[in-house]
Amino acid sequence: NYVGEDLPALLKYKGKTNEMFTDTMLTMALAASAFMPVHDSQLVVCDPMAGRGTTLMLALRRGYHGVGLEIGKADVKEAADYMTRYLEFHRIKYKRTDSALTVRGQVGGRENKFVFSDSAEHFKAGDTRTLRLICGDTREAAALLKPNSVHLMVTDAPYGVQKGTAGRQDSIGGTIAAALPGWHSVLKPGGVPVSYTHQTLP
């Protein structure tokens, strides 16, 4: 493991997807993609409905990079604060930056970005991993993320969708249908999306 087994396990919250199941989804996505031979340090995993980041923490544990989109400000803050506490407790060298993101000329989201490494020597040499926690609408993925920047996309849809957008509850099918073009644009050719829902799509 690139970081400790406890990274995805310590953060507890209502609605958290089972870690073993989420890890299986990551394995499925990688196996179905064109990136099995790609070195871990180059793989970018995106959770477009990230919640508090279980999928991203599992990706980091493997040595991948992680980027998450989440509409809930409280969830993004909790994930960012947790990551800060974890890195500091384990004395892992890191740099955190917080910034606003622009969508069509207006502030469309905020990003908490962590750059860290498994050793001080690797950090100094630039051999690092990145976690990006973006508070923004997943339907704006094409504006919030660069085209062809993600190798794998893994999410547990109900947790993200139940947050709604702008104070309203959106259907799972409606939200995903609206988000799909943007998701497709940020996936690299050969990339794979894997989404789980216990509900039935229309």
Where are these regions (language model features)?
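Class I S-adenosyl-L-methionine-dependent methyltransferase catalytic core
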Residues: N1-P202
